[in-house]
Swiss-Prot record:
Its cofactor is Mg(2+). It comes from Sinorhizobium medicae (strain WSM419) (Ensifer medicae). One of its GO terms (cellular component) is phosphopyruvate hydratase complex. Keywords: Cytoplasm, Glycolysis, Lyase, Magnesium, Metal-binding, Secreted. This is Enolase. The gene is eno. Its main location: cytoplasm.
Amino acid sequence: MTAIIDIIGREILDSRGNPTVEVDVHLEDGSFGRAAVPSGASTGAHEAVELRDGGTRYLGKGVERAVDAVNGEIFEAIGGLDAENQIQIDRTMFELDGTPNKSRLGANAILGVSLAVAKAAAEAAGLPLYRYVGGPNAHLLPVPMMNIINGGAHADNPIDFQEFMIMPVGAETLKDAVRMGSEVFHTLKKQLAADGHNTNVGDEGGFAPGLASAPAALDFIMKSIEKAGYRPGEDMYVALDCASTEFFKDGKYVLEGEGRTLEPGAMAEYLAELAGKYPIVSIEDGMAEDDWDGWKALTDLIGNKCQLVGDDLFVTNSARLRDGIKMGVANSILVKVNQIGSLSETLDAVETAHKARYTAVMSHRSGETEDSTIADLAVATNCGQIKTGSLARSDRLAKYNQLIRIEEQLGPQAQYAGRSILRG
């Protein structure tokens, strides 16, 4: 009854107007699942490969080759298989691809099918996706990391760090957390406008003002939290995504906006200084993706009191994560489904992290769609944190709105992670 009878891949557009893959999966019993694949702007060198067409069409960014793989080879290989056997389906696609990084068929093709299969199986079981994937204990609503100021590769301004986020840990519920974040977001907009800054929003819905440094951005955020009626370091904390690989050159960290170049040890000390001055509870990619010594220095310095998240470092890859665990590097993994390219491998990465007492943060990409799958996966894995952009742009709000629905569905079972995510 849950055999796959049809798979339809198509090329659609993401939130940046670039092509991406969408997949429909139909089952024998009439059940249906649809998934759209996200895409990143700053990508790690060790990520699974997103297949693009090249040439002049869509300026080389078309995904017709990946769509053809979905409608051709992949359907031929998994048509007739039971949608409830996720691991078998994913493994069949890995073997069909035959490369270590999914570069032949494309991680975008494989992931689209993988997620759509899970959604179809959930519908066949009469369960919401979070319950189907997570089982009866899926009940924890994540603390949002809300990206309200953008720099780096996500903005055309002098700020070197890529994202400045707020985390409403003092909320009682996810719904309250979204409200608190929205209030701070709109307060920040007024503060920026009053000081003559641009308030246009970037790829992820955050503002990209012409501020010169990380401290300048953090000072604005502190003022906005207070003006919105909340207490920094009590109701609301701050998280950073440095995306340090983007400015790591010849073994040094070149902070052009701040006019200085730092050795890895000095970069670690600078981040420790910021974490001491501001209520920063999470730093993502504080060091470059292959600067393992720098990561170790940063972890030794503040890993006992600050969440240190590996994004480009781990790329949702359990093998790289295990290397980091052995070396005592970082203490958290950012989980992006398209970095690894399948649902089963994504779940394995979260499980590997939790077994080692590392935290996991479910994450969007800068190129998103209205697909809200990651909201369900955050609850399914009880990971307790989600990074899905600002309080603007419907591609970001789709995830927050889905979390509000899930919290409502769970009723008294629902628990907001809140302060439980804090270290030290």
